Amino acid sequence: MLVLVTLIFSFSANIAYADSESDCTGSEPVDAFQAFSEGKEAYVLVRSTDPKARDCLKGEPAGEKQDNTLPVMMTFKNGTDWASTDWTFTLDGAKVTATLGNLTQNREVVYDSQSHHCHVDKVEKEVPDYEMWMLDAGGLEVEVECCRQKLEELASGRNQMYPHLKDC
């Protein structure tokens, strides 16, 4: 009897694992505008390999998309004070060029969950950083877990910051 119960449990666990693996099929093809919920939702940075990640960083559309550009207000905590900056995101498929005055950051959405509740970005620099963004309103637990798994895979053991746990 114990062998039968163990066998059934093992089989059930394997099916659950297989289902969770197939649930992690991201949105294809990856499109940054889709990943940003077509500019209708705010996203918070929940994990990052960048040791200088801003505390409580949130990106929120600050207007309508014009051609391939989207104005985005980035809000963050600077010590105990809140600060905001107005960026322009230029979107090209999965690629995003974020511009603030003379500062430019290039990134690519490398994973986007099916319902766009979370996504993982690769920040292009000599040693790329990876970031996990989630809807400010929250997301489907299974999709958030898929984003977390994708970030773990890409970050391959690098230290991660949790900027949204900083008294936001």
UniProtKB/Swiss-Prot annotation:
What are the protein's UniProt keywords?
Complement system impairing toxin, Disulfide bond, Pharmaceutical, Secreted, Signal, Toxin
Tell where it localizes.
Answer: Secreted
Binding-site list for (12R)-hydroxy-(9Z)-octadecenoate: 54, 85, 107, 119, 121
Q: Which residues bind leukotriene B4?
A: 54, 87, 107, 119, 121
Gene3D superfamilies given in the database record: 2.40.128.20
What does the entry list under GO cellular component? Answer: extracellular region
From the UniProt annotation, give the residues forming the signal peptide: 1-18
The lineage's top-level taxon is: Eukaryota
- Where (9Z)-hexadecenoate binds, per the record, is at 54, 85, 87
Query: Which Cys pairs are S-S linked?
Result: 24-146, 56-168, 118-147
Whether Ribonucleoprotein counts among this entry's keywords is no
Q: Which GO terms label this protein's molecular function in UniProt?
A: toxin activity
Which tissues does the record link to its expression? Expressed in salivary glands.
Q: How is the quaternary structure described?
A: Interacts with complement C5.
Q: Which family does it belong to?
A: Belongs to the calycin family. Lipocalin subfamily.
Could you tell me what this protein does? Bifunctional protein derived from blood-feeding ticks that specifically prevents complement-mediated C5 activation and acts as a scavenger for inflammatory modulators such as leukotriene B4 (LTB4). C5 and LTB4 binding activities are independent. Inhibits classical and alternative pathways of complement activation by preventing the cleavage of complement C5 by both classical and alternative C5 convertases. Inhibits complement in all species tested (rabbit, rat, guinea pig, mouse, pig, and human).
UniProt-recorded name of the protein:
Complement inhibitor
- Record lineage: Eukaryota, Metazoa, Ecdysozoa, Arthropoda, Chelicerata
